[in-house]
Curated annotation (Swiss-Prot):
SUPFAM superfamilies, sorted: Cytochrome c (SSF46626)
Chief site of localization: mitochondrion
Disulfide bonds: C21-C103
Family in the record: Belongs to the cytochrome c family.
GO molecular function, one term: heme binding
Lineage: Eukaryota, Metazoa, Chordata, Craniata, Vertebrata
Function of the molecule: Electron carrier protein. The oxidized form of the cytochrome c heme group can accept an electron from the heme group of the cytochrome c1 subunit of cytochrome reductase. Cytochrome c then transfers this electron to the cytochrome oxidase complex, the final protein carrier in the mitochondrial electron-transport chain.
Name this protein carries in UniProt: Cytochrome c
Keyword terms of this UniProt record: Acetylation, Disulfide bond, Electron transport, Heme, Iron, Metal-binding, Mitochondrion, Respiratory chain, Transport
Source organism of the structure: Aquarana catesbeiana (American bullfrog)
């Protein structure tokens, strides 16, 4: 679907300030994204989520991430993620390809 190398660059530029993506990695301002794919919203152990994230009740996958990453506050009103989103579909596809590759168990 997307390009993993391009996705890595997007992660470094737009995500790494607040997120890690490594097994056993620490939470930053945002949760460690390792194991994100297939996990329900608000479920990274040891991270303090808003009720909005905990109660959304969806499982992260390509489709849900495509929608969320376009406009996080619209997808989960009340989230504390301050990122405005990635409007370009191709960039979202690249980022998701990277997340699936680098952050999967």
């Amino acid at each position: 679907m997307g390009d993993v190398e391009k996705g890595k660059k997007i992660f470094v530029q737009k995500c790494a300030q607040c997120h890690t993506c490594e097994k056993g990695g620490k939470h930053k301002v945002g949760p460690n994204l390792y194991g994100l794919i297939g996990r329900k919203t608000g479920q990274a152990a040891g991270f303090s989520y808003t009720d909005a994230n905990k109660n959304k009740g969806i499982t992260w996958g390509e489709d849900t991430l495509m929608e969320y990453l376009e406009n996080p506050k619209k997808y989960i009103p009340g989230t504390k993620m301050i990122f405005a989103g990635i409007k370009k579909k191709g960039e979202r596809q690249d980022l998701i390809a990277y997340l699936k590759s680098a952050c999967s168990k």
